[in-house]
Amino acid sequence: ASSKPGWYLMIVKAVLNGREITYDVTFNKPEVYLMGPVTEAGDWTVKEPWALFTVPTTADGEFVSPAFAHDGSGNDSPRAYVIIPGHEKNWWHSEFIVGISGDKISYRGKGGDQKRVDGKAGQKMYLNFTTDTGKIE
């Protein structure tokens, strides 16, 4: 835990021990990454340093991606994710995108790929987790 205000990625792990549930709570840096063919590498490389979003300094601020290096549409549209320690190979378990409405964050969860907004080289992804909104421009 921290006494410093700011953005954190809170991870809660629950383990069933007989009839009791034990919780382990950790607070990590809020590292949000851009993913996919729109990145500088143009592929599905995990934790690409170039792909790290900037973190807002206010409670209602936006996480902002680097400018897309390439166009992306359909399954190659811009995606974002956070890494849950121990799940680096399954980054899509913590994936989110700007949904097809163009103004809401859509979380993948356990489902398949969602419909997403296309992106053009030079555009950025903006995510506001306080209002659960996002945009690509």
Predicted region positions:
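Structured interaction patches on ligand/partner-binding surfaces of diverse proteins
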Residues: 1-17, 88-136
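C-terminal edge beta-strand
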Residues: 14, 21-27
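Aromatic-rich carbohydrate-binding modules that target alpha-glucans
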Residues: 28-75, 85-104
